[in-house]
Amino acid sequence: MTTRWPRSLSCLIVTALSSALLVGCGEDDDHGRSCSGRTGKDLSSRTVAGGDLWQKKLRCVNLERSTLTGLVSEANLRRGNLYAARLVGVSLENVDLRGADLRRVDLGSATLSQVDLRGADLSGARLDRGLLTDVSLEGAQLDTVELRAASLTHVGLNGADLVGADLAGATVSDSDLRGARLRDADISTTTWENVLCPDGSRSSARNSCADHPSRAESRAAGQFPAPSAALPDSP
């Protein structure tokens, strides 16, 4: 026996299912991460002058898809959401961006000085022609980041993930890349000046970090065997 639903009820069910599918698969999921259990100031999708952020404590601020202009100085934007924000040509000085979401951010030709980006996510970000000095990027996610023709001086990249990054024409000097992952990164035309390479060796005029990947990456590529397990002591 076939059960026949009233037409009004059938339409209601179809509408509900369609709405659920749109919510689950639509473009609304294309957003940055917000702080768990905490809501910061909402400055999303607008133009924000750097002076408005001067010396402000805006932890967990929402700057998603916003355009920042001018100089941003002495601001605490820790764990902020800057997903797909536009900061082209902006100057960042003494800014705390630890743990921030900067995926797909555009920092082309920007100047960063004494900026703390430890643990931040800059996947797919653009920093081409950027000037980075005294910047902390330890443990940051930088996969597929664009750093073409950028200048990096006194930059900490210990343990950073630079898989698939583009550093063509970039200059890296007096920086620390120990433990950084550079698999599939374009570093064929990168200049290395007094840099601690991923494997701990130091670059020189004849010694490029392109030839000194981290030990984990070298083992994965079969360049040298993994350390053998210790044998138990004889009774």
Regions found by a protein language model. Name each.
Residues T15-S19, L231-D233:
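N-terminal processing/targeting junctions
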Residues G26-S234:
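Tandem repeat scaffolds
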Residues T2-I13:
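Bacterial N-terminal signal peptides that target proteins for export
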Residues L21-G24:
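C-terminal motif of bacterial Sec signal peptides marking the signal peptidase cleavage site
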Residues M1-T2, P235:
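C-terminal "tail" modules appended to repeat-scaffold proteins
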Residues S8-S10, S18, S228:
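Serine residues within intrinsically disordered or low-complexity segments
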